[in-house]
């Protein structure tokens, strides 16, 4: 190699790789996962964290309720009630995301079908309105029929979009076409009807279209269930209050020390009954052995000689 020959320059790919050589890929991955965890915790505590906190507060109230000061006890009871409310919200949110993932594919297919049907009906209506060859009375009747079908098709489309995400999705279309085709895995959990009747939530969507509450219906803020009627929310509030105060009631209902004596008497009664049962069992065994021995003696006396005698 001569002295005047220039040194080989590293390639662009090599230079680019060397410029990031100080960054460890594992370290970068750890940093990204850490930011994701921080972002997740910014949203709110998870279901498991809330359950752990509720369990800890319940244990504290159950064990040290007589030793805690009044203000601390009240603060812990409020914290318990808040954690239970947060847990209920977190479970609803988790169930909502689960139902969205479960019925997303079927909603997509039926939304495409409803959109296609609505477009076809509107095309027929446009042609019918511009056709002057038909009788006016017949054309009016046909237009009225098409308008009813278009209205129903619009409700079908809104049903596929705004049906409550927290509830099971009932299919709009009957099962006739799917008898000949294999069912997709995503469609196995969908409730279908062979009669073609509209599900109960279809009429709720129709009413929400008139009221302008489709967004609230989809997010489950109207409290509408699968039957198309409002759910009973009073039971949830009662359960929260009962869970919060059950510890205090359980603690106050403790019996005095006389209960221990009663338990001891019951244990003595059980042990005496057990001993009586064992005695009778032993006597039965003795009598059975004596009977068997007597039968064997009789058999030996009556024996007239066998193969080994």
Swiss-Prot record:
Residues 1-37, 176-196, 244-309 are annotated as: Disordered. Residues 260-270, 280-292 have a biased composition (Basic and acidic residues). Keywords: Coiled coil, Nucleus, rRNA processing. Residues 293-303 have a biased composition (Acidic residues). It is found in: Nucleus, Nucleolus. Residues 70-134 form a coiled coil. Involved in rRNA processing. Residues 249-259 have a biased composition (Basic residues). The keyword Nucleus applies. This is rRNA-processing protein EFG1. It holds the Pfam family Efg1. Belongs to the EFG1 family. The lineage of its organism: Eukaryota, Fungi, Dikarya, Ascomycota, Pezizomycotina. One of its GO terms (cellular component) is preribosome, small subunit precursor. InterPro entries: Efg1 (IPR019310), EFG1_rRNA-proc (IPR050786). Signal peptide: none annotated. One of its GO terms (biological process) is maturation of SSU-rRNA from tricistronic rRNA transcript (SSU-rRNA, 5.8S rRNA, LSU-rRNA).
């Amino acid at each position: 190699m001569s002295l005047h020959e220039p040194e080989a320059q590293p390639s662009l790919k090599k230079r680019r790789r060397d410029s990031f050589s100080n960054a460890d890929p594992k370290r970068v991955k750890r940093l990204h996962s850490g930011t994701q965890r921080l972002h997740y915790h910014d949203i709110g505590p998870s279901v498991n964290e809330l359950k752990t906190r509720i369990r800890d507060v319940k244990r504290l109230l159950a064990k040290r309720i007589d030793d805690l000061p009044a203000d601390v006890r009240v603060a812990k009871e409020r914290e318990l009630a808040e954690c239970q409310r947060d847990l209920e919200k977190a479970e609803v949110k988790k169930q909502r995301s689960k139902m969205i993932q479960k019925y997303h594919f079927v909603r997509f297919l039926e939304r495409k079908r409803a959109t296609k049907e609505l477009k076809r009906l509107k095309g027929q209506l446009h042609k019918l309105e511009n056709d002057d060859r038909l009788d006016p009375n017949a054309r009016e009747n046909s237009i009225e029929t098409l308008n009813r079908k278009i209205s129903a098709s619009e409700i079908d489309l809104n049903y596929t979009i705004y049906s409550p995400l927290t509830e099971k999705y009932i299919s709009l279309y009957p099962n006739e076409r799917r008898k000949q085709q294999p069912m997709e895995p995503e469609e196995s959990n969908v409730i279908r009807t062979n009669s073609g009747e509209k599900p109960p939530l279809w009429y709720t969507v129709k009413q929400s279209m008139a009221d302008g509450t489709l967004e609230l219906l989809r997010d489950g803020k109207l409290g509408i269930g699968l039957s198309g009627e409002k759910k009973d929310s009073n039971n949830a509030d009662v359960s929260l209050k009962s869970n919060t105060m059950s510890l205090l009631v359980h603690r106050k209902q403790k019996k005095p020390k006389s209960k221990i004596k009663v338990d001891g008497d019951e244990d003595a009664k059980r042990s005496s009954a057990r001993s009586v049962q064992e005695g009778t069992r032993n006597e039965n065994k003795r009598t059975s052995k004596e009977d068997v021995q007597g039968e064997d003696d009789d058999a030996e006396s009556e024996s007239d000689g066998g193969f080994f005698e």
